[in-house]
């Protein structure tokens, strides 16, 4: 499919932070949350979002606070923080050219790959899954060849996550067993932030809080039994790109990054 070709980043249609689907997303509650915080507290120093998720609350805090600490155990969330809030300079023209290249891919000429073999015809339409796998491998190859710096790498991976989010044939963490509607990939870049005061972590929240300081701590842990690392296993797989062996109907890798906040240990974990 040849779609949405642009000459520059400024005039390109871009993904906004809130464009991604995510369980527990606070997009509709953010204004209310920040109003309460501002009415009950003073100062504009350091804001800590210890379970950042999509980082929608952290982004809102950036309008007031000089420093915002973001933390999440998921690789697919951490890479989005580096993409949106990283401070390393990046070449927008280079990424626009790559986005255009990805939008003109002919899936018929792309070989089967790890992504299409595992997720094609299940989570994603077969031809789309070949494109996704090709793009992911191309991003990795360019990074290893030093054609991308770490910020450009993060922006491309995050843009890929946002691009495929609405194409997924899923209900929760598994796929819907019915024919998949064919839709174009339509690769778009994200709208990066100009905020320079972000500090980004990927650590166990209970350990991290012992080593950081701030004025406001916003604590919004997982609150259901579904592990986020299992719910978003495709994105975790896509970002890490270790190409693990997958198991079960939902095609998940071996468990990792399991949160005690999603278990009967939640109460004791909070006390800690």
Language model features with spans:
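Conserved SAM/SAH-binding loop
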Residues: 202-207
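Glycine-rich phosphate-binding loop signature in dinucleotide/nucleotide-binding domains
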Residues: 40-43, 145, 211-215
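General small-molecule cofactor/ligand-binding pocket signal
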Residues: 69, 199-201
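S-adenosyl-L-methionine
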Residues: 1-46, 50, 56-63, 87
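Class I S-adenosyl-L-methionine-dependent methyltransferase module
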Residues: 67-69, 73-192, 225, 229-271
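A short helix-to-beta-strand connector/capping loop
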Residues: 191-199
């Amino acid at each position: 499919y040849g779609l949405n070709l642009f000459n520059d980043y400024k005039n390109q249609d871009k993904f906004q932070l809130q464009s991604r689907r995510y369980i527990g997303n606070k997009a509709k509650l953010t204004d209310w949350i920040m109003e309460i915080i501002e009415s009950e507290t003073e100062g504009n120093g350091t804001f800590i979002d210890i379970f950042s998720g999509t980082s929608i609350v952290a982004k809102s805090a950036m309008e007031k606070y000089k420093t915002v600490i973001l933390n999440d155990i998921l690789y697919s969330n951490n890479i989005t923080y580096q993409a949106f809030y990283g401070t390393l300079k990046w070449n927008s023209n280079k990424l626009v050219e790559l986005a255009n290249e990805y939008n003109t891919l002919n899936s018929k000429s792309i070989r089967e790959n790890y992504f299409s073999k595992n997720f094609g015809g299940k989570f994603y339409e077969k031809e789309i899954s070949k494109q996704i796998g090709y793009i992911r491998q191309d991003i990795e190859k360019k990074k290893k060849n030093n054609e991308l710096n770490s910020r450009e790498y993060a922006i491309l991976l995050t843009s890929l996550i946002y691009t495929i989010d609405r194409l997924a044939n899923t209900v929760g963490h598994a796929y819907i067993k019915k024919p998949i509607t064919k839709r174009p990939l339509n690769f778009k870049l994200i709208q990066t932030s100009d905020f320079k005061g972000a500090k980004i972590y990927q650590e166990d929240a209970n350990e991290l809080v012992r080593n950081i300081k701030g004025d406001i701590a916003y604590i919004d842990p997982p609150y259901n039994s579904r592990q986020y690392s299992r719910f978003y296993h495709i994105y975790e797989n896509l970002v890490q790109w270790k190409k693990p062996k997958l198991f079960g109907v939902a095609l998940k890798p071996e468990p990792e990054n399991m949160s005690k906040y999603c278990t009967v240990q939640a109460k004791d974990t909070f006390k800690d």
